């Protein structure tokens, strides 16, 4: 795994070695020390201290460790955690998730050994004493929407309370690629970050080229069934519905955006019957406590077209939900899954191979064909290709 050794001052490892040799020669001459001292810059001083300055996506100037000094990183949420471990899991200083055994099976080795230190997501808290005791050197905060003044205040407070630099990153859907490049540069993982960014850009461009020109009246209608009874959903305005829109679906959920901060707007069964979607994507009943089996088997749902046609699909959830939570890079696999499922003739890919590729690149987990098919569940093979 290659690392980037360039500092903010523009000194590479090679030029630093050359500089060191020249400095040693100069110091052997009378008066050289004062000459050298007079030439040192603020950036140069920071470099020798193992520090550099970056301007984060909130416009904040943050002093952080240079890549050669960076060993332990934490994050304010599971969303940011995925960026860190997908780039360099050995730099992860703890966990913002409490993973199940099923989720751990698809994650880098050693994840189960890391301490859970909390998360600010969903109004949660981070254990600040543990954060400092574990010698965390840097914290990433990644936002799935535009960074707000409240977000900035929260990160400033965290930085002030702990003395640990906090870097804020815009991780909104179309900025995921740039977020990877920015974080990768800070972590000394520019080559790997570029590989992931290019991969995501390729997925997005290919899917949009395949489904982006479908007129609204010809789009497949879809209902996203959340919660234990399937009677919560996400309207188009919700960030949790973004994957469906990008994949060319016509989201039928004509409900207000939830003000809870968690999504999941309430829906009545009568409304779903009236919308009569062609496809339903539901949470699974085992991992997420969803209503996929209820929807498939209950007489109350049987009048809906998606149920009658056998087009109720369970969203894969291990180690993360493919379409929405967290709203991060996992959505790019969901983008492929939904586009291929709704429009197999337009977006004709082998989802078994795509799942294997994604898990290998992003999660460091090489899975078999059977494991990929197990994750895909009843959506493999896609409807329309049976």
Give residue spans per PLM region:
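Structured C-terminal subdomain patch of bacterial secreted/periplasmic proteins
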Residues: 174-180, 185, 198, 288-386
């Amino acid at each position: 795994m290659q690392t980037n050794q360039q500092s903010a001052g523009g000194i590479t490892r090679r030029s630093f070695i050359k500089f060191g040799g020249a400095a040693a020669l100069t110091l052997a001459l009378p008066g050289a020390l004062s000459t050298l001292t007079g030439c040192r810059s603020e950036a140069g001083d920071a470099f020798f201290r193992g520090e550099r300055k970056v301007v984060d996506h909130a416009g904040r100037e943050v002093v952080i460790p240079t890549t050669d000094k960076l060993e332990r990183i934490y994050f304010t949420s599971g969303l940011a955690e995925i960026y860190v471990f997908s780039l360099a899991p050995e730099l992860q200083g703890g966990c913002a998730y409490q993973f199940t055994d099923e989720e751990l099976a698809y994650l880098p080795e050693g994840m189960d050994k890391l301490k859970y230190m909390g998360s600010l997501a969903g109004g949660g808290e981070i254990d600040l004493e543990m954060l400092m005791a574990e010698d965390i050197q840097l914290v990433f905060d990644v936002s799935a929407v535009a960074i707000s003044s409240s977000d900035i205040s929260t990160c400033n407070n965290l930085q002030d309370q702990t003395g640990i630099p906090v870097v804020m990153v815009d991780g909104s859907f179309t900025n995921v690629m740039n977020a990877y490049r920015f974080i990768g540069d800070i972590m000394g993982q520019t080559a790997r970050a570029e590989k992931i960014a290019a991969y995501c850009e390729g997925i997005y461009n290919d899917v949009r080229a395949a489904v982006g020109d479908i007129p609204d009246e010809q789009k497949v209608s879809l209902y996203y069934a959340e919660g234990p009874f399937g009677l919560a959903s996400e309207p188009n305005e919700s960030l949790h519905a973004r994957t469906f829109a990008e994949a060319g679906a016509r989201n039928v959920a004509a409900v207000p955006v939830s003000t809870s901060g968690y999504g999941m707007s309430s829906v009545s069964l009568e409304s779903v019957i009236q919308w009569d979607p062609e496809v339903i994507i539901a949470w699974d009943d085992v991992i997420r406590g969803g209503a996929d089996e209820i929807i498939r088997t209950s007489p109350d749902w049987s009048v809906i077209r998606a149920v009658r046609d056998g087009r109720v699909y369970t969203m894969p959830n291990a180690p993360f939900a493919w379409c929405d939570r967290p709203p991060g890079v996992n959505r790019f696999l969901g983008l492929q899954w939904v586009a291929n499922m709704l429009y197999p003739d337009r977006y004709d890919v082998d989802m078994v191979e795509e799942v294997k590729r994604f898990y290998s690149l992003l999660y460091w987990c090489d899975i078999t064909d059977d494991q990929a098919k197990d994750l895909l569940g009843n959506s493999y093979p896609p409807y329309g290709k049976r």
